[in-house]
Amino acid sequence: VPHPLAILQTVFGFPGFRGRQLDVIERVMAGVNTLAVMPTGAGKSLCYQVPALALPGTCIVVSPLIALMHDQLRAAEAVGIRAATLTSVDTNRAETIERYTSGALDLLYVAPERASGSGFRELLDRAPVALFAIDEAHCVSEWGHDFRPDYRLLRPLLDRFGHVPRLALTATADAHTRADILAQLGIPHDGLILAGFDRPNIRYAMSPRSGTTKQVADLVAATPGPGIVYVQSRAGTDKLADALSATGRPVRAYHAGLDPAVRAANQSAFVASEDMVMCATIAFGMGIDKPDVRFVAHAGLPKSIEAYYQETGRAGRDGDPAVAHLFWGADDFARARQRLGEVAEDRIAGERVRLAALASPG
């Protein structure tokens, strides 16, 4: 079996591992089921890509979004990894299945709804599986900020192939969510690797709202380079994008109300740009591979501390200085308290704690 460091240097061109990457990789290669909670920008994908290249068989990567899978596929293929996606929009599914069964894939990306189906289990019986990597693993927990019920259906697949190590990965999970991920995915409590959350290159700031458009425009003017501005509504996103266009910077909008082709074009333009501002709802950002984002602004309160950490963590992934600025108003907290009334009774206590954390001056 090739040494992980040799793979890192020859395939990826990095001189050495960062943070807890090697700890995670060595556990996975020893067959230990693991949950890795690592900061945004810490290189979580290497934690399954390196074992996938070292171990016999194919690594199955469960990922929540088709766009995210296709971004990861392009990045993997760019360094020569044999990878494929198996999604509803792929027209080459028969070819991908043939590549899997003939042992010609290092990585196979699938959505949780496909991975949990009986047909997929039968496919995996036809060739060796090296590893299950469950990306964005907080989606398995009702306590997480982005719960996806399909993630709850993965356990039978994992248990069917109980001899195959499983690696769950997330950047955002509080203690309650971590415990739930471990329980839902059958990972022992001593399988947790918790890296630090500090992002020292990001300068965090908060300001009371007093004319949001001007405040954000001033931030844009003061901060060269690409940036993301999170807005709480679709209409607000379009309105702010129009207003910021007057700054002279290229500005695009991104929200679920736009035509999918427009969303995709705007995302591609942002990823390729050196100075674009993206005004977006929280629909934008998961898996965006853009290391040079120089600022992330919030024109209102995010829905939780975890969501705030994940969204601001899209800034400065290249390690250079970046800014995260939150513009808040008392009405944000009023709306958040109103939303508590829509939460299931067994989750109200936890959501109150989250809201209190957002309101805390520390």
Where are these regions (language model features)?
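Short acidic, hydrophobic short linear motifs in intrinsically disordered regions
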Residues: 360-362
